[in-house]
A protein has these predicted regions:
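The feature represents the membrane-entry module of six-transmembrane cation channels
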Residues: 2-565
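Intrinsically disordered, low-complexity serine/threonine-rich segments
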Residues: 555-582
Length: 582
């Protein structure tokens, strides 16, 4: 069935049909090493797709994009394949010597196979090399019950304790935390201070659909730009700049409030308004945008300014789609969950008794771990500390990337280039601002160094702290840069007006504030006077539900997106697992 596609080191195991060989293999390899690689999971996904396309009949009806449930895949694919290979687990069939565990995957078995693989492959931590997943790690043709007699010594527990990362896979049917084994894994994560993340599916198809829906707005903007250039409509262009500012602010605020439809409208209006100035020349734009240089440098800055704002609205639309997906995953993780693992169940009475005995009187602590995960999308010691101090963590694990990507990418490179030009061509290009703006160089250098330090710190932090850092940057830069600089954009006082100078200093030094909170982290921020309120500001997101949200179904039904979605072969949702198959 696998067409001999496995790596060569697994071939000697193919003809070992004896149960005792499989038992000895699993005894020889530590349970925490019953792992697969990213490539193994992609191979598993492709093989299941292949057998479906070849006409294998599964014992249930299923949607092609989701695939059959894991229960059915286990019975009709995993068991037969591993039985033919020698009755070892699928993981040891692929990697007979085992692999060190980096990632522990929790799921609930009722999820559909392509939901599971899509979410795990999309959310796989980039530093993780190997993953432990019960359906592929445990030998499904052997006596699994014998492995679970002591929950604390089960393969689940040993693998989780060895892992660096933990991923919970929601599904569209029921919360994984209605399963007691999944609750027990949350207990183990609490005991060993693991960070738990929620897996989510790929959003590239939805993002592509959203960009296609923005194409008419782009055409409208370009058309208005042509008309304005021909007619020299300066007053009208100033109105368009005002619309751009309003759309930019609406896009930022609506994402922080979870107003997805308002965000959609703002991104369309913003893209149309900025597209007007793609056609017009730079001198017209520079009447309303203050540029500290002259000549070709000024023209280059004008064009980069326009392009950055144009790119912002495209990235903001990706953020909107991602935010909506995160909301849907949060809802899936809460489906039928009754607020405590006291109500969770086990398929085996013996397992339930053993698990509840091991958790003992720490049920409330486990419930807090799960509650933080349900609210934030991430559960960690730092976030739990914030939660216990009364910080609202709703969707704290979601970050807006549009602002950080711009200020840490093209705008940072632009700043470095301007500093280089200022130093090399001080007598020629920099004279206009050197006379009236002598502090430009030290302020700009401070801004650049702060952002570089932020990037270095970001690479060394855990995922929960990284989310906090990006949220800090998005909110502080939004407040200090976008809003105030947009006010300056509409001013008539020229670049060297007092307002422009103040705004430049505030924008540049705002990155020192960002770096300050990044160094403190979540726990350090909580210790500051008013720390709870600051953490609330940085972490929380006001979510307005109801008719303001665009659903995935609405996206799929739109004519612009129907062709893109019709080509989709993998989607959606999955859950967390330690429940053994019977």
């Amino acid at each position: 069935m696998l067409d001999g596609s496995l790596r060569s080191e697994t071939v000697p195991l193919w003809h070992r049909g004896m149960t005792d060989v499989a038992i000895e293999l699993h005894k020889a390899v530590h349970p925490a090493r019953w792992c697969i690689t990213f490539a193994d999971l992609k191979f598993f996904q492709s093989e299941v797709r292949r057998v479906i396309q070849d006409g294998m009949t599964f014992q249930e009806n299923f949607e092609a994009s989701y695939g059959p449930s894991m229960y059915v895949v286990n019975e009709q694919y995993i068991k037969p394949v591993t039985a033919a290979a020698g009755k070892m687990s699928w993981a040891l069939m692929m990697n007979p010597d085992g692999l060190d565990c980096d990632l522990f995957i929790t799921h609930a078995w009722q999820e559909d196979v392509f939901e599971f693989t899509d979410k795990v492959l999309t959310s796989w931590p980039w530093r993780a090399r190997h993953a432990w997943c019960c359906m592929l790690a445990n030998p499904q043709n052997l006596d699994i019950g014998a492995l679970l007699q002591s929950p604390s010594m089960s393969p689940f527990a040993l693998a989780l304790q060895s892992s660096k990362y933990m991923l919970v896979v929601p599904n569209r049917h029921k919360s994984v935390y209605t399963r007691l084994w999944c609750g027990y894994e949350a207990y183990l994560a609490f005991q060993s201070n693991k960070i738990i993340r929620t897996a989510s599916p790929s959003i590239w198809r939805e993002a592509l659909c959203s960009w296609l829906r923005m194409f008419p707005a782009l055409l409208v903007g370009l058309t208005i730009g042509v008309v304005s250039k021909v007619g020299q409509l300066d007053l009208f262009l100033q109105f368009i700049l005002t619309m751009r500012m309003i759309a930019l602010l609406a896009s930022l605020v609506s994402q922080h409030c979870g107003l997805m439809r308002l965000c959609l409208v703002a991104n369309h209006v913003g893209l149309a308004s900025i597209s007007v100035f793609i056609i017009t020349d730079g001198t017209l734009w520079s009447k309303y945008v203050h540029i500290p240089f002259s000549g070709m440098t000024a023209l280059l800055l004008v064009n980069i300014h326009r392009i950055c704002i144009w790119v912002y609205f495209l990235l903001a639309e990706v953020d909107r789609v991602n935010c909506q997906t995160e909301m849907e995953e949060a809802e899936a993780l809460q489906k039928q969950y009754q607020g405590s693992i006291r109500h969770a169940s086990c398929s085996e009475v013996r397992d339930e008794v053993n698990i509840r005995h091991e958790i003992g009187d720490q049920v409330d602590e486990v419930d807090k771990v799960i509650q933080v995960l349900l609210k934030a999308g991430i559960s960690s010691d730092a976030l739990r500390a914030a939660y216990l101090q009364g910080v609202e963590l709703r969707h704290a694990g979601f970050v807006q990337l549009a602002i950080p990507v711009l200020v840490l990418g093209p705008l940072l490179l632009l700043g470095c280039g301007l500093v280089g030009q200022y130093i090399v061509l001080l007598d020629e290009a920099a004279d206009p601002i050197a006379e009236v703006y002598p502090f430009w160089l030290p302020v700009q250098c401070t801004s650049i160094l702060a952002r570089l330090a932020f990037l270095c710190l970001f690479c060394r932090r855990s995922i929960d702290e990284q989310c906090f850092m990006l949220n800090v940057m998005a909110k502080i830069v939004t407040a200090f840069y976008v809003f105030m600089l947009e006010l300056s954009t509409l001013g008539n006082g020229g670049f060297c007006s007092e307002l422009s100078i103040v705004l430049f200093i505030v924008y540049s030094l705002s990155f020192l504030v960002v770096l300050f909170f990044a160094v403190l982290g979540i726990r350090g921020t909580l210790k500051l006077p008013g720390g709870r309120q600051l953490a609330q500001f940085f972490l929380s997101r006001l979510v307005v539900s109801g008719n303001w949200r665009l659903s995935r179904t609405q996206l799929e039904s739109s004519p612009e997106c129907s062709e893109v979605f019709s080509q989709s072969t993998g989607d959606a949702s999955d859950s967390s697992g330690s429940e053994s198959s019977s």
